Amino acid sequence: LSRPVVCMENVLQQGVGAKPATASKAKTAKRRPWMAYIAIVPFFLVVILYELAPLAQLALNSVIGRDSEALGLENYIRVFTTPLYTQSIWNSVWISLLSVVVAFLAARFCSEASPRVRNGFTMVLNMMSNFSGVPLAFAFMILMGNAGVLTLIGEQFNIPFLANFNLYGFDGLVMMYIYFQIPLATLLLIPAFAGIRKEWREAATILKASTFDYWFRIVIPNLMPSILGTLSVLFSNALAAYATAYALVMNNYALLALQITSRFRGDVQTDAATGGALAIVLIALMVICTLVNNYFTRRAAKGREIV
């Protein structure tokens, strides 16, 4: 009888001792809530110094007139009435749209290919995704520049497309934008295309629906939220691209990102007012793309929950 009594005494002593230990830990945790706030102070400093403060400066510059130095919309009026700036906005939007369409088609081809082709294509895309910016522009210059390898081959064998290809203009920019858009489009769109079910095709075939009806009345409406959300990401990615375009054409082609840089780093004098207005226009386009992506992402999530 003595051994059970001793064991019970040990259990009671451990239980009594455990309560104060647990209570002390809880009190310690309650006493140190400021530790969590201190941990995120560096993050807030980075956001304020490198995002909010420059954005506030850009917004202020954009509403201070370059000539009158008064608050107003003088800079925005200049942006949307000067042919150079309107052409820059249009060129950026047009090149972005073209690259998005071609990247979309490439992603669709990859999703329909056999597993062997898809794996090989994905392996190539993984290498392509790590090759962008200035190295990408330099590689295209070596291949298709005025004295590039493919250009010389085109001249030697009388291939007009290669011999007369203008790398330092619209065609060259579109080709390079497509190059760095295809990997991102494929990675983002393959999961969306994987949502196409065989039952949809079987049901459409039973109901004698044409291929056009199958795609435009069944597949695209069901995948539209995912597709449009991804396309908005691709569009914003191309719209804000700077390093590759600058390394290739510098300021010799009208693009929105290049014009913003030229306003702040002018050869003769700077124009922070117009540059700020152009930057706010670019930010507005990016915000629209982000809102579109968020909206369609939520719709796609609701659709998956319903299914």
Where are these regions (language model features)?
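Amphipathic cytosolic juxtamembrane alpha-helices at the membrane-cytosol interface
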Residues: T28-P33, F170-G172, I196-G229
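Cytoplasmic juxtamembrane regions at transmembrane-helix boundaries
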Residues: R108-V124, A192-D213, A301-V307
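Loop-to-transmembrane helix entry/capping segments in MFS-fold secondary transporters
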Residues: N119, A204, T270-G276
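A short amphipathic helical element positioned immediately N-terminal to and/or at the very start
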Residues: L71-F80
